[in-house]
Structure formats: C-alpha cells, structure tokens
C-alpha cells in the first residue's frame, strides 16, 4: 500500500482539508479524492510522503500528473 497526501484547496488557495490516505495506486487515490471533495473545492493536490507532487485537478478539469 502506498501513502498519499491529499490537499483540498479553495479559489484563494486556502486549505479546506488535508488528509493522508493509504491506497493501492495513484488512480485509487484520485478516485477517493474526487469523491471526498466538498462543493467549495477548487483544486485537489496529491503528493507522496515526502511532498513530491504527483497529480492535481481543478474543479472543472481532468486529472493531470506532475
């Protein structure tokens, strides 16, 4: 199981929620993050344990990997 840090941001780039999850893959972390995002979420950032950016998504777009 891999560890992913998920950060939910609003339009002003303020952190709405931040969580650490254990998932089998980045795809599973993306699905989980999308499901748990609130209506106020503008951007979702996913990074690994050492805060290396792995993927991000804006509310109106698709996932993009860094």
Predicted regions and their residues:
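Generic detection of short hydrophobic beta-strand segments and adjacent strand-loop junctions
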Residues: 19-21, 57
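Short aromatic-glycine-(Arg/Gly/Cys) micro-motifs in beta-strand/loop hairpins
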Residues: 1-17
